[in-house]
Swiss-Prot record:
Protein name: Penicillin-binding protein activator LpoA
Domain of life according to the entry: Bacteria
Any one GO molecular function term: enzyme regulator activity
Keywords associated with the record: Cell outer membrane, Cell shape, Lipoprotein, Membrane, Palmitate, Peptidoglycan synthesis, Signal
Lipidation (S-diacylglycerol cysteine): C27
Pfam families given in the database record: LppC
InterPro entries: LpoA (IPR007443), Lytic_TGlycosylase_superhlx_U (IPR008939), Peripla_BP_I (IPR028082), TPR-like_helical_dom_sf (IPR011990)
Major location (coarse): membrane
Length: 678
């Protein structure tokens, strides 16, 4: 029995030890709070993970997971779900959670494109109170709220953010800093005032001056950049040069000794192809000079209703009813300049080179693939063309290694290191109009367009550019034929300044109140109709015959004091405006290529003479002249950001995809005369 008694006593003495071990083991398996690491940015996951953790947690830990889930949902583009979860946050938060909530409110505003609301919330945050990872997000929010508009505040935000970033993000930051600097005009840059201790900003502004002074001379630019890097060795941009300036340092000019010109020389598009050829060959033989800043011209012929334009698929013309239409002969008296041109700031010319070998290839006679093979065999150094859109799309599929200045652009632009796109299209003109109208401080535009595919394309291009510039909803209204417009005038109905949204805002991503915190999920009426403001700008795409009815109909319905400024495309200007028409159009602004605005009178006379005074064909002639200039500066357009040519079809610059943008001249009817818009 002794062994049995001993065993019971031993078991009794061991029981406390076993219980203690079990208790400590239980403590060891308890999951620690991991939310802090995620809050500090040392770990990351998706919203599904955070939502799961939130459901399994309580108290402060649950709130942390909820905040993390909101941040992830915003990042994933699930703004509506983020708003719903944001509104469920409790009122009682600790200091760290309150700071995170405030920052999330800003990020949600930005996701909803409520930039003014985001800026109001940012003004209430002191960045020094934030954790380091939150500071990087704060400065990013400041950057996003600027919508890419260059300013001293944007530059300061980028500079403050840079030390907080990793290597990959630093490169993006430096490129964004340079984008802001190079997007400024010299006039904007001259107005900047900085503090004495802002050494990094001072360095960036000195680099900007180097760029302004040398952007049209790649060799001088290279030397200027190298000197700047020596003077500012500690500037982030000197240590990691912006991508665009790296391209400048690697610049090599393209050869134009042997040029292949690809144009349609037969069929419906032949008249356009041959007109471009005329302009190109004229420039090759006599050279080009920078076109003067806009001067207004006052044509003296009477306005006449224009013939219906013919349609040729895929050809680009800025004034006509499709990407390819051109009108018939429209005789007009020679315009008379009424003001002197300003001095050009981008004095880039393309010298004559009569000895350059030029070979014309007819794209209407054989498949483009065969033509490109022949061009390579012939040893061309650069291709200019093709003109038709479907041929440009075939060109992209061919993956040609040749440098190409395409005279049109495909539906979907592809960034190719050897291709630039130069088109005269109604869409291109509409984008310029959006920029011009936005620059004039207008907020609520209406696009008045023909009931056609042309109208749809123009409306979409205008709205896309308007919203890219930070504008809101754009309205559209369509009109019918000239006979319908005439009937409207006779019936006294007029045209109301109302319309339907071209690109309505998504109903799931609406505004958030700027006070503490509830988020709307349905747009208000004001948001849906240009922030509740009346239409203050009307962009009209119409022929002279159509606009002769449209402008009086607007006045008939709205009165002369409607407050809306009227703008028109060059489609309304065909060189046939008589004194009565000019008086009727009083106050209306319209766009025109610089050559036909009087910026290059000798070439205008030469072009109009060559095309029997057809203004639409004169624009194509000017396109041929500018194609020569662009071909001679192909590498600069492709590689040197900000390189600019004051061309006959506009002030020419290239975007990162080497799509040539054209800034047009803007003119205005004033007391029976045509004057530059000041």
């Amino acid at each position: 029995m002794v062994p049995s008694t001993f065993s019971r006593l031993k078991a009794a003495r061991c029981l406390p030890v076993v219980l203690a071990a079990l208790i400590f083991a239980g403590c060891g398996t308890h999951t620690p709070d991991q939310s802090t690491a995620y809050m500090q940015g040392t770990a990351q996951a998706d919203s599904a993970f955070y939502l799961q953790q939130m459901q399994q947690s309580s108290d402060d830990t649950r709130i942390n997971w909820q905040l993390l889930a909101i941040r992830a949902l915003v990042k994933e583009g699930k703004t509506g779900q983020a708003v719903e979860l944001f509104n469920q946050l409790p009122q009682e938060l600790n200091d760290s959670q309150r700071r995170e909530k405030t920052l999330l409110a800003v990020e949600i505003k930005l996701a909803q494109k409520d930039f003014a609301g985001a800026q109001n919330l940012l003004a209430k945050i002191t960045p020094a109170d934030l954790e380091q990872n939150q500071q990087a997000r704060y400065w990013q929010a400041k950057i996003d709220a600027s919508q890419g508009r260059p300013s001293i505040d944007l530059l300061r935000a980028l500079i403050a953010q840079e030390p907080l970033l990793g290597a990959k993000e630093k490169k993006q930051n430096i490129d964004a800093t340079w984008q802001a600097l190079s997007s400024m005009t010299q006039e904007q840059a001259n107005t900047l005032v900085i503090n004495a201790d802002e050494n990094i900003l001072q360095g960036w502004l000195d680099l900007q001056r180097v760029w302004f002074d040398n952007r049209n001379d790649p060799d001088m630019m290279k030397a200027g950049i190298a000197d700047w890097q020596k003077r500012y060795p500690n500037n982030p941009g000197a240590k990691m040069l912006p991508t665009q300036l790296v391209n400048v340092k690697a610049f090599k000019p393209a050869s134009t000794n042997k040029i292949a010109l690809l144009l349609p020389l037969n069929g419906q598009a032949a008249v356009f192809g041959r007109t471009i050829q005329q302009g190109f060959e004229a420039a090759k033989n006599i050279g080009t000079q920078p076109v003067a800043a806009q001067v207004a011209a006052a044509p003296a012929a009477d306005v006449a209703e224009q013939p219906q334009p013919q349609t040729v698929d895929g050809v680009a013309s800025p004034a006509q009813a499709s990407v390819s239409d051109l009108t018939g002969d429209q005789p007009a008296a020679q315009p008379v300049p009424v003001s002197a041109p300003a001095t050009s700031t981008a004095a880039v010319s393309a010298p004559a080179n009569p000895s350059a070998e030029l070979k014309i290839y007819d794209t209407s006679s054989q498949p483009l693939s065969q033509i490109l093979s022949q061009v390579q065999q012939d040893g061309a150094s650069i291709v200019v063309g093709p003109l038709l859109k479907n041929n440009v799309e075939e060109l992209l599929k061919s993956n040609t290694p040749l440098n190409v200045l395409a005279l049109n652009q495909p539906e979907n632009i592809e960034n190719r290191v050897n291709i630039c796109y130069f088109a005269l299209s109604p869409e291109d003109e509409a984008r310029d109009a959006a920029r011009h109208i936005r620059d004039q401080g207008k907020q609520a535009p209406l696009v008045l367009i023909p009931r056609s595919s042309l109208g749809d394309r123009v409306a979409n291009a205008f709205a896309q550019e308007w919203q890219k510039l930070g504008g809101g909803t754009v309205l559209q209204q369509k009109f019918g034929s000239t006979s319908e417009l005439r009937a409207g005038v006779n019936g006294g109905s007029g045209i109301a300044l109302t319309g339907t949204p071209i690109t309505p805002r998504a109903t799931t991503d609406s505004g958030m109140t700027t006070n503490n915190p509830t988020l709307q999920t349905t747009p208000t009426d004001d948001q849906f109709t240009n922030n509740g403001g009346r239409v203050d700008a009307v962009y009209i795409v119409a022929t002279p015959g159509e606009i002769a009815f449209i402008k009086p109909m607007i006045a008939m319905r709205n009165g002369s004091q409607s407050g809306a400024m009227l703008y028109a495309s060059s489609r309304s200007a065909q060189g046939t405006a008589g004194p009565d028409f000019r008086l009727e159009m009083e106050g209306l602004q319209y766009s025109e290529i610089p050559m036909l605005a009087g910026g290059n009178l000798p070439l205008m006379q030469q072009a109009l003479s060559a095309v029997n005074n057809d203004y639409s064909l004169a624009r194509m002639y000017a396109m041929g002249v500018d194609a020569w200039s662009l071909a001679n500066h192909f590498s600069q357009m492709r590689q040197v950001q900000g390189f600019e040519i004051n061309g006959n079809t506009g002030s020419l610059t290239a975007n990162p995809d080497c799509v040539i943008n054209r800034k047009l001249s803007w003119l205005q009817y004033q007391q029976g005369q045509v004057v530059p818009v000041s």
